[in-house]
Amino acid sequence: MDKLRVLYDEFVTISKDNLERETGLSASDVDMDFDLNIFMTLVPVLEKKVCAITPTIEDDKIVTMMKYCSYQSFSFWFLKSGAVVKSVYNKLDDVEKEKFVATFRDMLLNVQTLISLNSMYTRLRQDTEDIVSDSKKIMEIVSHLRASTTENAAYQVLQQNNSFIISTLNKILSDENYLLKIIAVFDSKLISEKETLNEYKQLYTISSESLVYGIRCVSNLDISSVQLSNNKYVLFVKKMLPKIILFQNNDINAQQFANVISKIYTLIYRQLTSNVDVGCLLTDTIESAKTKISVEKIKQTGINNVQSLIKFISDNKKEYKTIISEEYLSKEDRIITILQDIVNEHDIKYDNKLLNMRDLIVTFRERYSYKF
């Protein structure tokens, strides 16, 4: 919203200066909210008349769109004259024209994002009842699993809730905003503050294409040195995954994916329980974090359920993001070395090549760390 405000101010300043000079009339007071509503109405019309508005849209298409934007619709020039945005563009020199086109394009793109947020905002409210029901059921299943004392008892819990688990996974994987909606149930800021919604949207929105790509990458990992554990949990996952629509529609080998996930789980458990280097890393991290996190503050907050935990994290997000970032960056080389040793020991390959953990982690950090 801040970026849109800056772009809007630039657009208004250039427009007012030129309109007042050309007509001799004085501009009215600016009402940004009023004008944004006009732009939100205009964007779908412009896309229908000219073309889709994308970051790569050509300059001449933007100029064409200017012909369909009349200033008399906006607060600062309401019903004053029939000038269109292109008439101001025509009066500018080449450098100013280039800047004006860029400003107008970026403003339309940001308005487009605002339209999307408004739509999601409406759906979040509409979907709350179903999501509350799903969330309660999920927590109930987790509670029963934690209370299970044997593998057979846990397997029975999963079997009894098989239909719900499959239908919920299908909902989650077919709706890129489903995770966001679940968080909204526990963090009311997503409903009341659109800027918070936009921030969370960037973090927790996952496209189907990204999911499919990630699943294929995991499925193609070669972890043949780790023995497959065909316990009842793995058998349940193997029975369930073929019923997931995302797997069906994208011809993903559910059995192969389940096998790799089982091996990864086995490997992680083994490292956490027997790898001395991993144990030392975790201990050092916890001890370091204790010096930066106020346990007393957490106790005073009175965290006693998922909702209060999510609210606490949300309210202190910036502080904890900084702590996590500092902890990770100070230990990145050590983490990479430990992971590469594990890869080397178990001969973990992708595309017939030994995984290079430094390349993988650094690439991920450079591409996606801005989200966190």
From Swiss-Prot:
Keywords from the UniProt entry? Host cytoplasm, Virion
User: Where does the protein end up?
Assistant: Host cytoplasm; Virion
Q: Which Pfam families match?
A: Pox_A6 (PF04924)
The cross-references to InterPro entries, in alphabetical order and at most eight, read:
Poxvirus_A6
Q: Which GO terms describe its cellular component?
A: host cell cytoplasm; virion component
Coiled-coil region list: none
What domain comment accompanies this record? The N-terminal domain is not required for crescent formation but is required for virion formation.
What is the role of this chain? Lipid-bound viral membrane assembly protein that plays an essential role in immature virion (IV) to mature virion (MV) transition. Functions in both crescent-shaped viral membranes formation and its enclosure to form immature virions. In addition, participates in targeting mature virion proteins to sites of virion assembly to ensure their proper localization.
Record-given protein name: Virion morphogenesis protein OPG132
